[in-house]
Curated annotation (Swiss-Prot):
<comment type="similarity">
    <text>Belongs to the cut8/STS1 family.</text>
</comment>
<dbReference type="GO" id="GO:0015031">
    <property type="term" value="P:protein transport"/>
</dbReference>
<keyword id="KW-0813">Transport</keyword>
<feature type="compositionally biased region" description="Basic and acidic residues">
    <location>
        <begin position="46"/>
        <end position="56"/>
    </location>
</feature>
<keyword id="KW-0653">Protein transport</keyword>
<keyword id="KW-0539">Nucleus</keyword>
<dbReference type="GO" id="GO:0071630">
    <property type="term" value="P:nuclear protein quality control by the ubiquitin-proteasome system"/>
</dbReference>
<dbReference type="InterPro" id="IPR038422">
    <property type="entry name" value="Cut8/Sts1_sf"/>
</dbReference>
<protein>
    <recommendedName>
        <fullName>Tethering factor for nuclear proteasome STS1</fullName>
    </recommendedName>
</protein>
<comment type="subunit">
    <text>Binds the proteasome.</text>
</comment>
<dbReference type="InterPro" id="IPR013868">
    <property type="entry name" value="Cut8/Sts1_fam"/>
</dbReference>
<dbReference type="GO" id="GO:0031144">
    <property type="term" value="P:proteasome localization"/>
</dbReference>
<comment type="function">
    <text>Involved in ubiquitin-mediated protein degradation. Regulatory factor in the ubiquitin/proteasome pathway that controls the turnover of proteasome substrates. Targets proteasomes to the nucleus and facilitates the degradation of nuclear proteins.</text>
</comment>
<keyword id="KW-0963">Cytoplasm</keyword>
<dbReference type="GO" id="GO:0005634">
    <property type="term" value="C:nucleus"/>
</dbReference>
<dbReference type="GO" id="GO:0005737">
    <property type="term" value="C:cytoplasm"/>
</dbReference>
<dbReference type="GO" id="GO:0070628">
    <property type="term" value="F:proteasome binding"/>
</dbReference>
Length: 292
C-alpha cells in the first residue's frame, strides 16, 4: 500500500538549505514510498545494500544558496545610527532639537557652547543675507511695495532678521571679538545689509530701519574706540584709514545717520596727521566697494 505524502514546510523568511537545493535543481526529492521502504531495512541488509551500491561523488551545494543564507541571516530590523538620523533632519528641526536638549541640562549647554566653532564673518553674513532675502520674498506679487499692506506682510520676517543681526552684532564687538579687523569687516558688510532694508511710505514704518542705523552707529563708535586703545597712536599705520573711506560712504547711503562714528574716526585720524593719499581715487574705490 502507498504511504501518505509528507507535506513540505517553508515558512516565510525561514531559509532551509536542503529545500533551497531542491528548488534550484541540485538533487531531486525522494519519493515517500521509497523513503519509507529504506527506513524498514534492517542494519544487516542495509550494510549489504551499501556494499553493492556504486560509490558516488559527494553532492556540491550551490554557492548562491550559501550567499543567500548569509544575506538573509544578516538582514535584521534595527534603528538608524545617530549620524544617519541627524542627517535626515532639516536645519530648523535640528536647531530646535539641540536647543531643547540644552535647555534640559545646563552641563550639556555649556559643553555645546565650548565645542561649537565660532562663526566667521563670512558664515554670519550668509545667515543674515538669507534672513533678509526671506523678508523680501514675502512682498506681494503686485501692487505697491511701500504701503502698509506690504509692510505688515514683511514685518515678521524683518523683525527676525533684525533679531539675528543684533545677536551677531554683539558677538563681533570687542572684547568678545578679539580681532578688531574682524569687527570692522563685520560692521562693513552688516551696514550694507541695512541699506538694503525696504523703505516705506509711512514714516512710522521706517522706524525699524532708523533704529537699526542708530545701533550700527554705536557699534562703529565702539570698534573705533577699541582700535584707538590697541593701536596706541598708530591708527594711520594699521590700515584703519581704509575703514574711514568705507564709513564715509556708509554714512552717505544712510542719510547721514552714521555721523557720530564717522566724526569720531575722522578726528582720531586727523590727530595723527592722517590724510587720504588721493581723495578722488578713494571715492572711486569706495564706489566699487559699496554696491548695495
Amino acid at each position: 500500500m502507498m504511504g501518505s505524502v509528507v507535506p513540505l514546510s517553508s515558512p516565510a523568511w525561514d531559509l532551509n538549505l536542503s529545500a533551497g537545493q531542491n528548488l534550484l535543481g541540485h538533487g531531486s526529492p525522494t519519493p515517500s514510498h521509497s523513503r519509507k521502504r529504506r527506513l524498514s531495512v534492517t542494519p544487516e541488509a542495509g550494510d549489504s545494500h551499501m556494499e553493492h551500491e556504486s560509490p558516488s561523488k559527494p553532492r556540491q551545494q550551490s554557492p548562491f544558496v550559501h550567499k543567500r543564507a548569509r544575506v538573509t541571516r544578516q538582514l535584521q530590523s534595527r534603528p538608524l545610527p545617530m549620524s544617519r538620523l541627524l542627517s535626515s533632519l532639516d536645519q530648523k528641526t535640528l536647531v530646535s532639537l539641540l536647543e531643547g536638549i540644552c535647555a534640559q541640562d545646563d552641563r550639556v549647554a555649556r559643553q555645546v557652547m565650548e565645542v561649537t566653532p565660532k562663526p566667521t564673518v563670512s558664515s554670519a553674513m550668509d545667515v543674515l543675507s538669507r534672513a533678509l532675502d526671506q523678508a523680501f520674498a514675502l512682498f506681494p506679487y503686485k501692487g505697491d511695495h511701500q504701503n502698509d499692506y506690504a509692510f505688515f506682510r514683511v514685518r515678521p520676517a524683518l523683525e527676525e532678521f533684525l533679531a539675528e543681526l543684533s545677536d551677531y552684532l554683539s558677538h563681533f564687538l570687542p572684547p568678545n571679538e578679539t580681532q578688531v579687523s574682524n569687527s570692522f569687516a563685520f560692521l562693513d558688510q552688516a551696514t550694507s545689509l541695512v541699506h538694503r532694508m525696504p523703505q516705506w511710505s509711512s514714516p512710522a514704518n521706517n522706524r525699524l530701519k532708523e533704529e537699526t542705523y542708530e545701533h550700527i552707529d554705536v557699534a562703529w563708535t565702539l570698534v573705533c574706540e577699541e582700535a584707538a586703545k590697541r593701536q596706541r597712536g598708530s591708527l594711520a599705520m594699521s590700515g584703519v584709514g581704509n575703514w574711514l573711506i568705507r564709513l564715509e560712504k556708509h554714512n552717505e547711503l544712510s542719510g547721514d545717520r552714521l555721523k557720530t562714528s564717522l566724526h569720531l574716526l575722522r578726528d582720531m585720524l586727523d590727530d595723527q596727521g592722517y590724510r587720504p593719499p588721493n581723495p578722488f581715487a578713494s571715492f572711486n574705490g569706495a564706489q566699487q566697494l559699496f554696491t548695495v
